[in-house]
Amino acid sequence: MGLLQELAGHPLAQQFQELPLGQQVGIGFAVFLVLSVVLNVLNQLLFRNPNEPPMVFHWFPFVGSTITYGMDPPTFFRENRAKHGDVFTFILLGKKTTVAVGPAGNDFILNGKLKDVCAEEIYTVLTTPVFGKDVVYDCPNAKLMEQKKFMKIALTTEAFRSYVPIISSEVRDYFKRSPDFKGKSGIADIPKKMAEITIFTASHALQGSAIRSKFDESLAALYHDLDMGFTPINFMLHWAPLPWNRKRDHAQRTVAKIYMDTIKERRAKGNNESEHDMMKHLMNSTYKNGIRVPDHEVAHMMIALLMAGQHSSSSTSSWIMLRLAQYPHIMEELYQEQVKNLGADLPPLTYEDLAKLPLNQAIVKETLRLHAPIHSIMRAVKSPMPVPGTKYVIPTSHTLLAAPGVSATDSAFFPNPDEWDPHRWEADSPNFPRMASKGEDEEKIDYGYGLVSKGSASPYLPFGAGRHRCIGEHFANAQLQTIVAEVVREFKFRNVDGGHTLIDTDYASLFSRPLEPANIHWERRQ
C-alpha cells in the first residue's frame, strides 16, 4: 500500500488525475498499446520455441502479419520463405498460422491424414451459410466423400461429349444478345462478362436445360452475392448482420428455392427427364447406409457444385482474356491453330477437338499457373505434427496453410517463372517446366470417391491435392478450353491503350481475381 500511495502522490499522477476523463482514457490506451508492443517484441526475441517454426516478426499482438499478408499473399509468402525457409509461422487475427511451401509443404498439408488435419473446422463457417446445411463441410468427412463420389461418377467421358456443344452454344448466344458486344468493335469490362458466361455454361451443362432456363443475368448476380460470402472477415463475422451477409442469406434462400421447386416438379413427373444431368443423378443417389439423398441436400449440393467452380472458372477465364488482350499475337496463334487443325471452315467444336488444340490447352494451363484462384488453403491441426526433415512439431494450437502457387512460380521448377508463356509447355521450350516424371507423380489413393493422384511430387497443383482435391478438374478444363476456343473464333482483343500492361490482382476475397474494372478492346473477326 505504501508504494501505491507514493505513486499516487507523485506529481505526474496528480497531473493525470486532474485531466478530463477523455484524455485519461486516451493516455491509458496509449500506455497499454506501448506495453503490449514491447512485451510482444520481447516475447519474440527472448522466448522463441526451438521446436516450432520461426515466427514472422510483427509489432502488434493479435493483428500480427494480418495486414501485410492480406495485401498481397503471394509476395508475403515469397519474402518470408527467403527469410525463414519453407516452413514458418505468422499471426493471422490472433491465430498462429504455419505456412509450409514447396512440393514437400504441399504434400505435408494437403495429403495430411484425417486424424491430423481437418478442413471442415476451418471452412464450415464460410461454406454452410453459402451452400446450405448438411453438405460439404457441414457434415462428417465420410459423408462428404460420398457426396463427392455421387458428383464425380456423373462426370463421364460421354457426359463431356455432350457438354462441349452446350458450352459452345451458350458462349455464342451470350455474345449475340449482350449489349456490350453490339457492333463491330467496342470496350467491355471482361470479368463481369466472364462471370456470367461461366455460370450460364456450367448451369446448362451440369444441371440441364430446365435449370438453365431459370438462370438469367439477375440469377448470375445472386451467385455473385453468394460468392461475396467468402470474404475473409467472415471467418470471424459470418453471423453478423453485415450488408454482404444479408445479401448472401437472401441469395442462398432464393437459389435454394429454385432448386427445391425444380426437384418437386421432377418428383411429381417421376424424375423421368430425358437429360442425364447432375440433378437427376443426385435425386437417384443413395448413401451407403441406405438413405436416399434428401431433396434439400440435392438442392444444396447443386449450389455447391456451381459455387465450387464458379469463382475459379470466372477468375481464370477473365485472366485468360486479359492476357490475350495483353498479347494479341497469341490470340492470333490460337485462331490459326484452329484453322490448321480443325479446318478453315471452323466446324462446330466437339470434345475430341479440344485434344487437337495443344496451344489452347496450354493457355489454360499457364494461366492457372500464374493466376491461381486460391492463394491459401488452410487446415486445422488435430494432433501434433512433426515436419519431415526438420526438428519442428506443429502443435494443435496452430492452423496450417498451404500455398501451391508458391511452387508454381518457383524458378527451380519453372524457368522465368513470372513470364506468362503458354509455349513453355512445349517440350522444346527453354522455359519447359522441370517437374517430376509422370511415373513419379502417378501415386494414386482412394479417399472414398475414386482413385485420384496424390500430386505429392508436383510443384503444379492448380486443383489442389489429397482428399479435398477438386473433383471438377476435367470439367473445368473442358469448360475453359471451349470458352477460349469460341471467343478466339469470334474476336480479336487488345488492351484499351494498345500497350502490354496487365491489371493488378484483387486479394480482398479469399479468391484471387482481377481488379475491376478490367476493360479490354474487342473487335469482331470479319
UniProtKB/Swiss-Prot annotation:
Residues reported to bind lanosterol: Y123
Gene: CYP51B
Induction: Expression is positively regulated by the FgSR transcription factor that targets gene promoters containing 2 conserved CGAA repeat sequences.
Membrane spanning stretches: 27-47
Keywords: Endoplasmic reticulum, Heme, Iron, Lipid biosynthesis, Lipid metabolism, Membrane, Metal-binding, Monooxygenase, Oxidoreductase, Steroid biosynthesis, Steroid metabolism, Sterol biosynthesis, Sterol metabolism, Transmembrane, Transmembrane helix
PROSITE patterns named in the record: CYTOCHROME_P450
Primary site of residence: endoplasmic reticulum
Membrane topology: Single-pass membrane protein
Pathway where this protein functions: Steroid metabolism; ergosterol biosynthesis
Further remark: In Fusarium, the biosynthesis pathway of the sterol precursors leading to the prevalent sterol ergosterol differs from yeast. The ringsystem of lanosterol in S.cerevisiae is firstly demethylised in three enzymatic steps leading to the intermediate zymosterol and secondly a methyl group is added to zymosterol by the sterol 24-C-methyltransferase to form fecosterol. In Fusarium, lanosterol is firstly transmethylated by the sterol 24-C-methyltransferase leading to the intermediate eburicol and secondly demethylated in three steps to form fecosterol.
Cofactor dependence: heme
UniProt-recorded name of the protein: Sterol 14-alpha demethylase CYP51A
Superkingdom per UniProt: Eukaryota
Organism for this UniProt entry: Gibberella zeae (strain ATCC MYA-4620 / CBS 123657 / FGSC 9075 / NRRL 31084 / PH-1)
Function of the molecule: Together with cyp51A and cyp51C, encodes the sterol 14alpha-demethylase that plays a critical role in the third module of ergosterol biosynthesis pathway, being ergosterol the major sterol component in fungal membranes that participates in a variety of functions. Essential for ascospore production. The third module or late pathway involves the ergosterol synthesis itself through consecutive reactions that mainly occur in the endoplasmic reticulum (ER) membrane. In filamentous fungi, during the initial step of this module, lanosterol (lanosta-8,24-dien-3beta-ol) can be metabolized to eburicol.
InterPro entries according to UniProt: CYP450_sterol_14alpha_dmase, Cyt_P450, Cyt_P450_CS, Cyt_P450_E_grp-IV, Cyt_P450_sf
GO molecular function terms attached to this record: heme binding; iron ion binding; monooxygenase activity; oxidoreductase activity, acting on paired donors, with incorporation or reduction of molecular oxygen
Pfam families reported in the protein's UniProt record: p450 (PF00067)
Residues binding heme: C470
Family to which the UniProt record says this protein belongs: Belongs to the cytochrome P450 family.
Catalytic activity field: a 14alpha-methyl steroid + 3 reduced [NADPH--hemoprotein reductase] + 3 O2 = a Delta(14) steroid + formate + 3 oxidized [NADPH--hemoprotein reductase] + 4 H2O + 4 H(+); a 14alpha-methyl steroid + reduced [NADPH--hemoprotein reductase] + O2 = a 14alpha-hydroxymethyl steroid + oxidized [NADPH--hemoprotein reductase] + H2O + H(+); a 14alpha-hydroxymethyl steroid + reduced [NADPH--hemoprotein reductase] + O2 = a 14alpha-formyl steroid + oxidized [NADPH--hemoprotein reductase] + 2 H2O + H(+); a 14alpha-formyl steroid + reduced [NADPH--hemoprotein reductase] + O2 = a Delta(14) steroid + formate + oxidized [NADPH--hemoprotein reductase] + H2O + 2 H(+)
Subcellular location: Endoplasmic reticulum membrane
SUPFAM superfamilies assigned to the protein according to its UniProt record, in alphabetical order: Cytochrome P450
